Amino acid sequence: MPATVGALALALAVTGCDDSGSGKRGKGGSGSHSSASGGSDEKKTYRLGEESPEQESSKTTSKDGKYTVTPTKVETGTKADMENSGLKKDDKNGPKIPVYVWSTLTHKSGTAMEVGDMDDKLVMKTNTGGRTRALIVLMGAAKWPNCPEPDSSKKLSPGQSEKVCTAFLIPEGQKAAAVELSQGYYKAPLEWPVTN
């Protein structure tokens, strides 16, 4: 029966529906892209491999938890990856290709946090300005070469890190332009431009 049901995948587009409301302290600013002036709180653009500032958990179970995200590598998949993933074709929205983002999640302080609570704010920005959240798979798991699904329920204590790979689906013909880390409604996202 599961083979006939197929996998149902939802790629959520970011349309301002981040429910974090984290209330983080720091300077709001106008989102200036100048990273040379001011403190590290104002820096918005990073190189792949560069750690984010500490982020506060938006989950009630770990509300005092703080963590960092370090996107390290971005790779665009192929049509064959998509065909072999186990996902049904989405004829309504056109063909998609996967983009894989490897990141290191590091729990810095506070209550133990689940891996899924630390990577759920990652966003893929395309060269056309489109933004897509990570692929959420229901009723079966998608399979990607060299990008295993992370154990989202694994808990990390302060000082522990986990290397994860996250898959995003973007329209075929578009390119990955940047990995973004959403910081809620009122703060500009952090960005790691893709240079390849």
Name each model-derived stretch.
Residues 99-110:
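Short, well-ordered beta-strand segments enriched in hydrophobic/aromatic residues
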